[in-house]
Design a protein with these regions (language model features):
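Intrinsically disordered or highly flexible coil/loop and linker segments, enriched in small
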Residues: 278, 304-305, 333, 363-366
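Flexible mid-to-C-terminal extensions adjoining Fe-S/redox cofactors in radical SAM and related proteins
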Residues: 294, 302, 324-326, 330
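Short, loop-centered acidic/histidine patches that primarily coordinate divalent metals
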Residues: 300-302, 336-338, 345
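C-terminal scaffold of the Radical SAM
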Residues: 2-19, 25-314, 374
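A short, conserved structural fragment
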Residues: 328-338
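Short amphipathic alpha-helical interaction segments
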Residues: 314-328
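Short, amphipathic alpha-helical interaction segments positioned at domain boundaries
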Residues: 347-375
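Short, cationic-aromatic polyanion-contact patches
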Residues: 99, 224, 339-357
Length: 375
């Protein structure tokens, strides 16, 4: 499985570089959307070196990857460090054994500590832990215990994600529990509120939607300097207008359009065998989309946006403000003549605020099945 898949990804990269007008200059690489440390170090080396062969590397670059605490070895960490990777994130989720059994992810704290310590010993400059609230059987004590345990390792960043319960999707691993075992909306809200307060108490700063960082981390500095950006992989300290996603179901972003690869492995292979870039669907942004995108990014990255400049104005702004009027009454945001500022209380509703700007979503809302609760 490993070698054929790496071969396929490198073939896809070749197809892209064959049609690009110039040799690509890589500023960022993120290995994720899954756990690349399931691959042997030798295969990861072949993948990254194969990518490097057809590109130049920017002097100031940032390479990161996602690691599973149970199968990330020191060999993985050393190899990727030698290839230029300096940031790693580990999927911790929750330290409660009952919760871990329900989500089929048993991983003791000792494994998280081992890979965190090893990354720092090797020289990684940023280690992140991904925590999740709203998991089946999860209690407030579980959330606080998980935060406190991770805090003993002092990761540079902590992502505090909401669990998305999508029971109508089959085969997604969410089957070690019943629907009633998942915390209700009100309980889930409490888990988030108390968890956020604990993170702030122990010295982490809120830097964006679901993300917290120590003041010494580059992500925090980017937030303070209004240089934070967000893409499909999450927050980043640099902005690039072209992001090429490689692999099954990967998403690419050229700023003016999105494209997604085949989600089925056989279909992905078949397209590559025909020397076709395996994109199965996409969307070209129109001028209105581009303006809306900038407002949503401003809100997600800085909790404020303005339409004082003509290039940030659009016809439906009054409709958006009407949608947000109730939130202003509730103290979640302030609306001035040509600007919105999200309050501290409103930060946890940032997804809802951004949804008011998503005109395409508003237009199809009556027929849309909301994928999961925003919190």
């Amino acid at each position: 499985m490993e070698a054929p898949y790496i071969d396929a990804v490198l073939k896809e990269w070749q197809l892209y570089t064959d049609v690009l007008v110039a040799r690509p200059l890589i500023k960022e690489i993120h290995l994720g959307g899954g756990t690349p440390t399931f691959f042997k170090p030798s295969e990861l080396k072949r993948l990254i070196e194969g990518i490097f062969e057809r590109a130049d590397i920017a002097e100031h670059h940032e390479f990161s990857f996602e690691g599973h605490p149970n199968n990330t070895s020191k060999a993985h960490l050393q190899l990727l460090y030698d290839l230029g990777f300096r940031r790693v994130s580990y999927g911790v989720q929750d330290y409660s054994e009952k919760v871990q059994k329900a989500i089929h992810r048993l991983q003791p704290f000792e494994n998280v500590k081992r890979v965190t310590d090893q990354a720092r010993e090797i020289g990684y400059t940023s280690v992140s832990h991904d925590l999740v609230f709203g998991l089946p059987f999860q209690t407030l004590d579980d959330v606080l215990y998980t935060i406190d345990k991770s805090n003993t390792l002092r990761p540079d960043r902590i992502a505090f994600y909401s669990y998305a319960h999508v029971p109508w999707i089959k085969g997604n691993g969410q089957r070690g529990f019943k629907d009633e075992d998942v915390p209700t909306g009100e309980v889930k809200r409490q888990l988030y509120e108390e968890g956020k307060q604990r993170l702030l108490q122990v010295g982490y700063a809120e830097i964006g939607m679901d993300h917290f960082a120590l003041p010494t981390d580059s992500m925090y500095r980017a937030f303070e300097q209004h240089q934070l950006h967000r893409n499909f992989m999450g927050y980043t300290a640099s902005k690039t207008q072209v992001m090429i996603g490689l692999g099954m179901s990967a998403i690419s972003d050229s700023w003016y359009g999105f494209a997604q690869n085949e989600k089925d492995l056989e279909a992905y292979y078949e397209r590559l065998e025909k020397n076709e870039i395996p994109v199965c669907k996409g969307h070209i942004l129109n001028p209105e989309d581009l303006i809306i995108r900038r407002h949503i990014l401003n809100l997600m990255c800085q909790f404020t946006t303005s339409w004082a400049q003509p290039e940030l104005q659009f016809a439906e702004i009054d409709q958006v403000l009407q949608q947000l009027s109730e939130m202003q009454k509730d103290g979640l945001l302030h609306i001035s003549e040509k600007q919105i500022d999200v309050t501290d209380e409103g930060k946890k509703f940032i997804r809802n605020i951004c949804m008011a700007f998503d005109l395409r979503l508003q237009r199809k809302m009556p027929e849309t099945k909301i994928f999961s609760m925003t919190v």
